[in-house]
Design a protein with these regions (language model features):
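Short acidic DE-rich linear segments
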Residues: 68-71
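N-terminal acidic leader/helix
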Residues: 1-33, 37, 63
Length: 71
C-alpha cells in the first residue's frame, strides 16, 4: 500500500483515514480486475481497456475538488 501524503507532503497520520484510503484502493483494484477480465473474456483488446480506464482516472482527478491545506 502507498504512504498517503497530505498536500504539504507529510504522511497522513490518522489511522482511520489511512484505513479508509487503503480499503477504497483495494475495492477499486478488485473492480478493475473484474472489469478487465470481463472485457478480455468478451474479446476486447486489453490495451484499449487499460487506455479507457486511464482516461477515466484522469477525468475523475480533473473533476476532484481542490486540495485543502490544514491551517
Amino acid at each position: 500500500m502507498p504512504v498517503w501524503l497530505q498536500v504539504d507532503g507529510k504522511p497522513v497520520s490518522c489511522l482511520e483515514k489511512i484505513k479508509v484510503l487503503n480499503e477504497n484502493l483495494e475495492e477499486i483494484r478488485a473492480m478493475i480486475a473484474d472489469a478487465v477480465e470481463d472485457g478480455v473474456l468478451m474479446g476486447c483488446d486489453p490495451a484499449q481497456i487499460r487506455a479507457v480506464f486511464h482516461k477515466l482516472v484522469e477525468a475523475a482527478a480533473a473533476d476532484a475538488p481542490p486540495a485543502k491545506r490544514e491551517e
